[in-house]
Amino acid sequence: MNIGLLGFGVVGGGVWELAQENRALNVKKVLVRREVPPLGETAVQDVEAILRDPDIDTVVEVLGGLHPAYEWICRALAAGKDVVTANKAVISAYYRELTALAHENGAALRCTAAVGGGIPWLVNLQRCRRVDTVTEVGGIMNGTTNFIMDAMARQGADFPAVLQRAQELGYAEADPSADIDGDDIRRKLTISANIAFDALLREEDIPAFGIRTVTGADMKDFRAHGFTCKLLACAQRTETGVAAYVEPALVAEGEPEAAVPGNYNLISCTGELLGRQSYFGQGAGRYPTAANVVQDCLDLLAGEDGFYTETARPMAVEADAVAHPYYVRTRTADPWLESVTADRWDSGVITGAVPVGQMLRWAAAQRQRDPGCFVAGIR
């Protein structure tokens, strides 16, 4: 396999290193922004040197971001080149366009590293789907937020201090919004649900509420009632669509998700025949992510196809099809909240079962009145 590698950052450097250990993988050219002496003549600064090279049969994209990654992936697929990417933003936003383009040109599109970092989640989800009807996918899909929630629960620390520590350790970006507001995990859920259900969901249709406003007092309240809080993604098959959403959730201390430490992930799928299967591991990092990129390349060599089918179709996102109780903390009185309140804890109230979509719409509106408002579903 002759590879054109787009990007030589943290993950790209890891891919290059791992590929050197496998004789079947020849990284012929690497797109870089500036000279990288160890790469020698392999390094190029013009993407055309890769996209127009007839000897390069596989393009590996690890640039990140939507553009120009999307345009370059499109050009590679249109030229009949297989594409391997770790770019969740591109795959989530343009899943329909990219899978169609790959199919039209007889090219493979693989993205195992886009969800779960080093966890072989998507390949095993695909294997489950081959023999069973998948009814639900989801779990802890973001290591940054799990690190924050775990540290707050274990150490009794407040959110700002733990976020700063996550940034110092390199787990959180300087601007952590994509992680703590739920955008990153929503992208991963979109990709997972599309593969699980042969769907064409759009990330903007999936409601999400993040952890930006959780407090140490909230966490103390949860612990006193036998819960811990995690940012969870969930997508369930319904009769007419998919109930998909992202929200903080109170998980009983004996449940598997409650025990997930630090920046680890725990992602699960449920099938009609196989029941629940879960995958645990590092959700990010140089070598875990690079390893899944290289695994995709090796799968292509073995004749494995890409993550798409001819039957993928648009499906309605129906977050209101699922209902459960919620913990709600807000300083602003609200008649609707009073009407659904069933119990009161020290820091907030507990509602009866409320449709997920309804609660997340209310929470988004309530944040305009009370920016510190926090909600969490109770599993």
Regions found by a protein language model. Name each.
Residues C297-R379:
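A conserved regulatory-domain signal marking ACT and ACT-like small-molecule sensing domains
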Residues Y70-R75, K88-R127:
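Rossmann-fold NAD(P)-binding glycine/threonine-rich loop
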Residues Q45-A86:
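Rossmann-fold NAD(P) dinucleotide-binding segment
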Residues N2-E17:
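Glycine-rich adenosine-cofactor-binding loop
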Residues L163-L266, G285:
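Substrate-binding/catalytic subdomain of NAD(P)-dependent oxidoreductase enzymes
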Residues P256-A323:
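ATP-dependent carboxylate/acyl-activation modules
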Residues R127-S192:
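Conserved anion/nucleotide-ligand pocket segment
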Residues E21-L39:
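NAD(P)-binding Rossmann-fold cofactor-contacting core
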